[in-house]
């Protein structure tokens, strides 16, 4: 908990100089709670499941986000987007099966709860699209750090080292402030169903990095990545077709 508190605190401080106007309202407060809960359940889930299992369970998020966006935002989702998300998720399953799956019931429950709150804070990012993304993320990360500090044990111990500081800065800046800002910024411009399917690109990029580092990548993992990208392509295909029809309509009037 203390490590997560530091991660959120540093991520929020990094964004503060770029925030136009700090705002705190009910929705931003709820966003902070949802983000904190998602991170907490994800971290605790990893104590019981392998990263491959966590990937399968966490990436049910788009499947949860679609009904939530309909319920909370009244957003409409096309059949093409749903098909793309289902195909993308099947790619995650194929990818993870090649890593080995040994499910733990408590791990399943914790990671699925993480996916639910991930979907929920994603929907709330979209709901808050009228606010400055930098300000929203700075406030929600700083609030989240207070929650984590409150939940941290009074007595704790960890060993300072250069590697620890490098890891902390990495997860705080790139994996914290910047990643939340980019996710929020995408949700300002496109519907939840359009953005969430892009999350399937994360395992693909991670695998590409592993390949560059010399980590063994088997054919099954590559097949899973191909299916993920197929899902992303299909989910965004309808938008391209609609643009093409508009352009053609202009020229043929």
Curated annotation (Swiss-Prot):
<dbReference type="Pfam" id="PF00892">
    <property type="entry name" value="EamA"/>
</dbReference>
<keyword id="KW-0813">Transport</keyword>
<feature type="transmembrane region" description="Helical">
    <location>
        <begin position="101"/>
        <end position="121"/>
    </location>
</feature>
<protein>
    <recommendedName>
        <fullName>Uncharacterized transporter in sor 3'region</fullName>
    </recommendedName>
</protein>
<keyword id="KW-1133">Transmembrane helix</keyword>
<feature type="transmembrane region" description="Helical">
    <location>
        <begin position="2"/>
        <end position="22"/>
    </location>
</feature>
<keyword id="KW-0812">Transmembrane</keyword>
<feature type="domain" description="EamA 2">
    <location>
        <begin position="116"/>
        <end position="237"/>
    </location>
</feature>
<feature type="transmembrane region" description="Helical">
    <location>
        <begin position="80"/>
        <end position="100"/>
    </location>
</feature>
<feature type="transmembrane region" description="Helical">
    <location>
        <begin position="214"/>
        <end position="234"/>
    </location>
</feature>
<feature type="transmembrane region" description="Helical">
    <location>
        <begin position="28"/>
        <end position="48"/>
    </location>
</feature>
<feature type="transmembrane region" description="Helical">
    <location>
        <begin position="53"/>
        <end position="73"/>
    </location>
</feature>
<feature type="domain" description="EamA 1">
    <location>
        <begin position="1"/>
        <end position="97"/>
    </location>
</feature>
<dbReference type="InterPro" id="IPR000620">
    <property type="entry name" value="EamA_dom"/>
</dbReference>
<keyword id="KW-0677">Repeat</keyword>
<keyword id="KW-1003">Cell membrane</keyword>
<dbReference type="InterPro" id="IPR050638">
    <property type="entry name" value="AA-Vitamin_Transporters"/>
</dbReference>
<feature type="transmembrane region" description="Helical">
    <location>
        <begin position="162"/>
        <end position="182"/>
    </location>
</feature>
<comment type="similarity">
    <text>Belongs to the EamA transporter family.</text>
</comment>
<keyword id="KW-0472">Membrane</keyword>
<dbReference type="GO" id="GO:0005886">
    <property type="term" value="C:plasma membrane"/>
</dbReference>
<feature type="transmembrane region" description="Helical">
    <location>
        <begin position="138"/>
        <end position="158"/>
    </location>
</feature>
């Amino acid at each position: 908990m203390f490590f997560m508190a530091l991660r959120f605190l540093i991520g929020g401080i990094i964004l503060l100089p770029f925030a136009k106007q700090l705002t705190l309202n009910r929705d931003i407060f709820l966003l902070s709670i949802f983000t904190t809960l998602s991170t907490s359940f994800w971290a605790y889930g990893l104590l019981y499941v392998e990263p491959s299992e966590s990937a399968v369970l966490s990436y049910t998020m788009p499947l949860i986000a679609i009904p939530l966006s309909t319920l909370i935002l009244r957003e409409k989702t096309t059949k093409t987007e749903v098909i793309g998300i289902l195909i993308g998720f099947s790619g995650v399953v194929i990818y993870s099966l090649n890593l080995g799956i040994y499910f733990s019931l408590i791990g399943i429950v914790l990671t699925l709860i993480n996916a639910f709150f991930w979907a929920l804070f994603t929907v709330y990012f979209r709901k808050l699209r009228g606010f400055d993304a930098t300000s929203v993320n700075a406030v929600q990360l700083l609030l989240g750090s207070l929650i984590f500090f409150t939940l941290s044990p009074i007595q704790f111990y960890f060993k300072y080292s250069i590697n620890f500081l490098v890891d902390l800065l990495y997860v705080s800046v790139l994996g914290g402030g910047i990643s939340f800002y980019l996710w929020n910024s995408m949700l300002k411009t496109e519907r939840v169903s359009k953005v969430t399917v892009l999350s399937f690109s994360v395992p693909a990029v991670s695998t590409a990095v592993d390949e560059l580092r010399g980590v063994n990548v088997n054919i099954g993992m590559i097949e899973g990545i191909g299916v993920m990208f197929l899902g992303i392509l299909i989910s965004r295909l309808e938008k391209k077709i609609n643009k093409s029809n508009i352009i053609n309509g202009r020229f043929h009037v």
